[in-house]
From Swiss-Prot:
The active site is at C433. The gene is thiI. Pathway: Cofactor biosynthesis; thiamine diphosphate biosynthesis. Its EC number is 2.8.1.4. The keyword DNA-binding does not apply. GO terms for molecular function: ATP binding; CCA tRNA nucleotidyltransferase activity; tRNA binding; tRNA-uracil-4 sulfurtransferase activity. SMART domains: RHOD, THUMP. Residues 54-156 form the THUMP domain. Disulfide bonds join C334-C433. It catalyses: [ThiI sulfur-carrier protein]-S-sulfanyl-L-cysteine + a uridine in tRNA + 2 reduced [2Fe-2S]-[ferredoxin] + ATP + H(+) = [ThiI sulfur-carrier protein]-L-cysteine + a 4-thiouridine in tRNA + 2 oxidized [2Fe-2S]-[ferredoxin] + AMP + diphosphate; [ThiS sulfur-carrier protein]-C-terminal Gly-Gly-AMP + S-sulfanyl-L-cysteinyl-[cysteine desulfurase] + AH2 = [ThiS sulfur-carrier protein]-C-terminal-Gly-aminoethanethioate + L-cysteinyl-[cysteine desulfurase] + A + AMP + 2 H(+). It is an enzyme of class 2 (transferase). The keyword RNA-binding applies. This is tRNA sulfurtransferase.
Amino acid sequence: MSLYMVRYSEIGLKGDRERSRMESILMDNIRKYYEIIGLRASCRIMSGHVLVEADGDGPLRHIMGIKSYSPVLRFRAETLEDITRIASEIYREKVRGKTFGVRCNRTGTHSFTSLDVERAIGDSLYDASAGVNLKNPDIWIHADIVGKDVFFYHEIIPGPGGLPLGSEGKYISLVSGGIDSPVSTWMIMKRGSPCDILFCSLSYPVDLRPFVDVVKKLVERWAPYRKPRIYVADCRSLIRTMVIEGRTKYSNVTFKRVIYRIAEKIALENGYNGIVTGESLGQVSSQTAENLKAIESGIGVPILRPLIGMDKDEVVDMARRIGTFPELSMGEFCSLFASRPIIRSKPEDIDEDMKQIDMEELFEGIRAYDIDDLSVALRTDLSLKGSIPKDAVIIDLRSRSQYEKDHIPNSINLPLGDAINVEDKGRTYVVYCGMGLQSAYVASMLRNRGITAYYSTFSDLKKRLSEKESGNITGIDQPAE
């Protein structure tokens, strides 16, 4: 096992009682993370740091509350001569041909000063090095002395910072399978607040797959010791109300109000301190200042928007850095309601739209899962695998102009409302659209009626046909169920 000195930042600014509480939470999280992945770890507080003895340092990079850490070598040394000798044995070859600097921190009473230590170690290594550089050396040598223990290290590895997860109150976070919402959730977790998660499904269970993939990435890397509760709201009825029947005037904004209302109900019934969203000011039509005001009007719990001042490029960079950037995307579900986006709505406009929404029906469709149970439940895959089934009815959901420009041979162009109402249960249907979300919705609705249906995208089917014609894939048709 190796030894690591773990540093925190804000915890050290707390009063004694709160500091002790947060230190305990941090150490508990460290031990649990290692235990869950099958490794050993022990830790204790030492002079404003956490000393961790563990099998490797992988988890330390991902535990909220850790500002930085260093692999350290610990020795017992009572005199300046002992400290200098040990430092020379460790670092003489490491500094050969390189510039270096020495930094010493001490806790306790000693017969020498920190400056004495720095000078003595520097003198002992100087002749083997390329010289001393106290501004930007090739290697910094650190000697932290606590009583008669000396800790040597030369690496400082950054952690995520923030506060220990679980040290602040919990929130319910709105998460999709996209880029923004997992980042906003991570940012609140970094501030010490556990987040349970709400997903509003418009093509249940198809759109759960990319959502679960992103959540698992977030949890497995950053909080395997505190897995979230997942709430899934079946919102497929909104497609008929808002898109097919067109009963709402401000659909792109009203849809967000609906999600807020669902989250509010969950928050009030389960003791969450507020709602976390991935909205950024002005990024899309529903996120103008006026629309954000209209969306949250009447919501009775606080709403946190960690990304409010961030550019999209900044969010994408952070998603890649924290490992939640989605490999595949069906498109943001909000795009279904954005054919005529409204950029400046008023609260009373959305209040009027909400009269068309049966919120009680949506509330009844909320289900709660553990993330592992939800993963097991998603065994049914409605996406098309292999070739198009023989004699399948191919439905193109794109606009008429897109269909006339190019389409899959033998496909028929149908609007969303007609596609979900096909009558021939003896046929197999392959439904495609631009991003895969509308086709996934239709496939899930047809499956609910006992009709065999698969979904895909126009680009994916074009690629499959091209590969088939070139002989890169077999021409065997996928059998119908």
